[in-house]
Amino acid sequence: MNSQPQARSPFFQRPQIQPPRAAIPNSSPSIRPGVQTPTAVYQANQHIMMVNHLPMPYPVTQGHQYCIPQYRHSGPPYVGPPQQYPVQPPGPGPFYPGPGPGDFANAYGTPFYPSQPVYQSAPIIVPTQQQPPPAKREKKTIRIRDPNQGGKDITEEIMSGGGSRNPTPPIGRPASTPTPPQQLPSQVPEHSPVVYGTVESAHLAASTPVTAASDQKQEEKPKPDPVFQSPSTVLRLVLSGEKKEQAGQMPETAAGEPTPEPPRTSSPTSLPPLARSSLPSPMSAALSSQPLFTAEDKCELPSSKEEDAPPVPSPTSCTAASGPSLTDNSDICKKPCSVAPHDSQLISSTILINEMNGVGEKLSAKENTVGMLRQEVLPLTLELEILEHPQEELKVECTPTPIAPSMLPAFSPAPPTPPTSPPCPPVVLSAAIARSPAVATEVQRVADEGESLRTCLSKDAKEMQDKAESESDGQAEETADPQSLHSGRSPAPVQTATTAPKSWKKTKEQTRTPDEVLEAEAEPKAEEELAVDSVLEPEQEKMSQGFPSERDPSALKRGKAEEGNGEEAEPVRNGAESASEGEGGDGNSGSADSSADGLTFPFKAESWKPADTEGKKQYDREFLLDIQFMPACIQKPEGLPPISDVVLDKINQPRLSMRTLDPRILPRGPDFTPAFADFPRQTPGGRGVPLLNVGPRRSQPGQRREPRKIITVSVKEDVHLRKAENAWKPSQKRDSHADDPESIKTQELFRKVRSILNKLTPQMFNQLMKQVSALTVDTEERLKGVIDLVFEKAIDEPSFSVAYANMCRCLVTLKVPMADKPGNTVNFRKLLLNRCQKEFEKDKADDDVFEKKQKELEAASAPEERTRLHDELEEAKDKARRRSIGNIKFIGELFKLKMLTEAIMHDCVVKLLKNHDEESLECLCRLLTTIGKDLDFEKAKPRMDQYFNQMEKIVKERKTSSRIRFMLQDVIDLRLCNWVSRRADQGPKTIEQIHKEAKIEEQEEQRKVQQLMTKEKRRPGVQRVDEGGWNTVQGAKNSRVLDPSKFLKITKPTIDEKIQLVPKAQLGSWGKGSSGGAKASESDALRSSASSLNRFSPLQPPAPSGSPSATPLEFDSRRALTSRGSMGREKSDKPIPAGTARPNTFLRGSSKDLLDNQSQEEQRREMLETVKQLTGGLDAERASTEADRSKTRELAKSEMCAVPAPDKPALSEEEVERKSKSIIDEFLHINDFKEATQCIEELSAQGPLHVFVKVGVEFTLERSQITRDHMGHLLYQLVQSEKLSKQDFFKGFSETLELADDMAIDIPHIWLYLAELVTPMLKEGGISMRELIVEFSKPLLPVGRAGVLLSEILHLLCRQMSHKKVGALWREADLSWKDFLPEGEDVHHFLLEQKLDFTESEGPCSSEALSKKELSAEELSQRLEKLIMEEKADDERIFDWVEANLDESQMSSPTFLRALMTAVCKAAIIADCSTFRVDTAVIKQRVPILLKYLDSDTEKELQALYALQASIVKLDQPANLLRMFFDCLYDEEVISEDAFYKWESSKDPAEQAGKGVALKSVTAFFTWLREAEEESEDN
């Protein structure tokens, strides 16, 4: 071989396939001729990773890879395609170039150290890139015979069974291919053969001749490989028996039949480092030409450290695999090894197949298998001739034919080192050869064949021989066995099946002694052998004996020197660095590159040898230290007593590496988890640190290593998740009754109802009710379903019960035919009440459930069970309580909407009051809070008194909880307060309410800020006399108590005790000068008045005695006006001179001021915070009685004659505006038109009322539609009662209309809102349409918006009146659209666009239209009878006719109601000869019409009964006819019980015709009615 040195690489290289080149025999085996650096050589900047001692199931050639049984990849590996470095063979090479281990990014993985084979756990390998099938090379064929089959030639079977770790077919791989899958014998890196103890000197390697064809030499001229040999160089020689099973049964392995792995050979063998020869052996040539495994046989097992295992196994690879010792590649002689088929027992095909399948098995099973195989299998022997020691009889054993890495997942071979020089076939020597003479013969034969090709050993080879002598014995067991096992099955290097990932490569730790490497690799082995049971223990013992007792330092130095020739620096493993650091002389001395290639453990002459089965076993200290991490040494045997002080559960955990890791290197997870997985067992070292360290660290004995679990993962195995029996599915995937369209429609209906209920709010109510009306509810099932949905929603959300009750009120007319009685119908109301009653009476069933649960709780003994049952019981009770309260609240709201009668409600109250349990009493409180005001009228007061007496008794007995007692007391207090709650019901709010509250809160905050600012500054104009000792004390609610003694000018000797110097005394009381204030009589009259916010009014200068302000009442009339927050106080603090610019503000008044004062007291009762600011908010003022107010009014009237009327308003516009806001705010809360009218009447004397109109419009413009409607009605009543003039009305609106166009930016619907404020005025006729429209159009014509407002007004009128009537009003007003639209706009187009064409349609004159509408009772009856009886018009048509021909007043008139009832009754009467009966179907059909116009009004219902009575009288009162009508009308809930009773007791003379006979005919009906009512009361 050429001695040309190669570029030194600081890292170990993996074995690779080098292009064959002409090799010149040379004494320097580490130097090879060639222009290119071997592709497998890693660059200096790449890191080497030592795999942890974890039983990782994958070798790391390219990062994390899985070797999964039955998993055959044809795609790229998990980690990604490796980058290939082109390798151009200098000579003709039939092999295709491919990626080598050095071609892959270092982040994916680093080479392994082959110092010692690591027993790999089940490797999960993801195949690397496919390699093109290499062309066959002519090589010398080696015939292999199987002694177990009578010497049968199994060479062809072995050759055809070669496999590759790559997904490509295992055809011979090109020499130039740098990928790991297969190694040619000449390309095998200097795999240090493991020499067994039979030979103490390890010179075999040096003397082994290597023969090879010349072309192969030329092809295989790889540069010197790293010192560490890849175990992948295991000889891939399989004997006949094995070959057959490999070829035939490897497909079965793919089928997933896991079988135990072949155990390592029982006899320890050690391979001495062989001097590398430039000439490969003929056997290697032959082997390299043929793959050992077929594609089926491959268990893609790419080693993450070695990527260049040649597809064609060679003797060299076998030996190297069997002995992945750390011998220097330079020391290895590339000598061919002949394999004698009969020399060793072949692993049975079943075992091999099972090994292939066992990749995914757990480590324990695999290692058990390994133990068995060791005992069963004779190693395949190769006879090699050692030039150096020819006299020594060496028995070469290629341990049981190399098994594919997939077959040996339990073994983690030592990390491979890429070859840089043609590897020499390692020789496995074992005592097993001695047991088989055939083996010896075959070995001799092979050696003879190689004589012609022998070359002199190079200097390096000799050095390696010396080195191997000292190391071969000890390493034989560790390296030869697993490597041989690995090499047999697959050309993939055995190290591919390494267990734990070796630690990452670190540039700092490039100097590692062979001892460290051996220790580091022994540790993973030991870790993996933990799972091996007693079967392996004898073998472990032998292995422990095979470790070297001493090392040859010269060999180490030679190995280090060898590394200089392109070898990679030894990777540093976590935990192994302790060896290098602790043994500094060993690890850190010499060159930076420490060689461990050929490291073996030689036995001393006096020590026991594995071949000596009877000898005494003796070991020295160093030898024992080397085996301290072997499986037998670190795993706790089963059955030991748990004595923590004597028996350790785990070995000491080595200290983690503190050196910075390469950020490109990903952490390796436990077991089979890939690098990118999330590791639950992260080491304390943090991210990026391998879980457990490989290298032993004797410097930290206190640390222990956790035993790991090997988890088998199978990618192809289908994981079946447990499926829930009643798993939720989307509606589209559910097994619905697809064949039943009715069921589908029903479910769709329920879905829509749920959607509407979820969106139901007071603001969205009208919108959603239209959607509900459009739903089709035509069966009893659907109706019940809808009722259940509404009811459940109502009781679940009591705060929204008002909205749900209103929804039910709108659906009360809904009727559907009964399912069991086709002729009968059932209505919504009846089913709803039944549902409520069922829920109301459910307490008995609930009690039974609670009692049962209570018994279970008492019977339970376990505390956990008792706790669980107790929680369940409490939860059930709480749920039942919430449902009961929700049901009661809902029932109360239904009663308030007249859907339930008083009798039913009294029945509920009595029932709840009888039960003294807390739940019933709580429901009672909720019910009375809801409906107490409606039940507590004059007629029912005696019953209510009984209820409350009983409640007071319950409170006094104190037998219930305090919570319930307080609730009862609250209801009692509520009744005493006339059912006016202290706080408003916290129900759902509209957006307007929320905005309003936020605005009020903001105003309150501003007011507080202003008050604080005012306190800080001096008020100008106020003379402060510090010497006077003014003492101002802050009182509650901003009231200030002034010390009278400080008022120096108050000199009246006798002051009435009732004179109030507190804020109630104001300007008026001091108007008489310094007389001392009001008299006692006056103060009595003024006691009810509120205090002024101007609390410094006593400091005002005295007014002239003759001025109008001298009246003692005048101050009270202005009490709410002198202070407007802090500003008011500032103004009132100023002295008011006689010639002030605004003397009337405080110095003028009238008796109307006093009346206004009293109205303000009433407003304060329920005023919001803004009102409190004006009135001072004193509780004493709120407690003023009506008697005081009436007394004050009388006093004011008596003074009116003495007080002249003011010439000007007493209040400024700003003050009127503030007061108007308070009046409007109170009115909108209590809707008391009478009170509001009185306040406005009083305000009109003090200021312009157009300000009130303007404030009313602005105040309600952005609030709810109901608010605007109420405001519009208030304005109409004020105009109608002439309290508000039309001029003020128009003027108040004009200011807003002028700005409306600009306001439309912020209020887009401003035109609709303005129309809602005006519509009531037009509807009720307060102002004529012409006058109103003309006035409103004036400010809008310049901006062209008059038409838009008129359009909104007319549309709103059409909703409340018919289009026909609105059109008539328009035409009657003689209005033309041209006057209100901008010039040039098409009137016709505008009317069509706004749908106002009805205003222009021709029709009869308004007088004719009005005269037609004024129909007599006879005409109404005729037309209605024609529609109902003759034309049988539907309800909508009747509604349209009534709307078109009658106005609202006529619709509610007795004439129309009687005519309608008469027509319906006539249509329902069926005459059979002389008998009459009622067709209930007709009545039921016309129930919507009757309900709409009777509107649940008792008076209207009474008129309908009068009409029915008259119709019966006309028919001469047929027997039972009236009773049948009464029954039907009652059942259909058209007529209420109150109306029936009222008709019965009616004494109206006009309705007495036939009344006696009629009463007699319905006596039974009334008797039944009363009995039913009494029954409900008793219940």
UniProtKB/Swiss-Prot annotation:
Compositional bias, Pro residues, is annotated for 167-183
The UniProt annotation puts the region (Disordered) at 1-35, 128-326, 454-615, 681-706, 724-744, 855-875, 1009-1037, 1067-1214
Q: Subunit notes for this chain? A: Interacts with EIF4A, EIF4E, eIF3 and PABPC1. Part of a complex with EIF4E. eIF4F is a multi-subunit complex, the composition of which varies with external and internal environmental conditions. It is composed of at least EIF4A, EIF4E and EIF4G1/EIF4G3. EIF4G1/EIF4G3 interacts through its C-terminus with the serine/threonine kinases MKNK1, and with MKNK2. Appears to act as a scaffold protein, holding these enzymes in place to phosphorylate eIF4E.
Keyword set for this entry?
A: Coiled coil, Initiation factor, Phosphoprotein, Protein biosynthesis, Repeat, RNA-binding, Translation regulation
Organism expressing this protein natively: Mus musculus (Mouse)
Residues annotated as region Necessary but not sufficient for MKNK1-binding? 1565-1579
| Residues bearing the modification Phosphoserine | S230, S232, S267, S436, S470, S472, S490, S1150, S1212
The MIF4G domain extends over: 750-978
Pfam short name (any one): MIF4G
Instruction: Kindly list the biological process annotations in GO that this record carries.
Output: positive regulation of meiosis I; positive regulation of translation; spermatid development; spermatogenesis; translation; translational initiation
Q: Where is the composition biased (Polar residues)?
A: 26-35, 315-326, 481-501
**Single GO term (MF):** translation initiation factor activity
Cross-referenced SUPFAM superfamilies, in alphabetical order? ARM repeat (SSF48371)
This chain's protein is named Eukaryotic translation initiation factor 4 gamma 3
Entry's Gene Ontology cellular component terms: eukaryotic translation initiation factor 4F complex; intracellular membraneless organelle; synapse
Q: Which SMART domains match?
A: eIF5C (SM00515), MA3 (SM00544), MIF4G (SM00543)
Basic and acidic residues: compositionally biased ranges: 295-308, 454-470, 506-515, 549-563, 606-615, 855-871, 1150-1169, 1179-1197
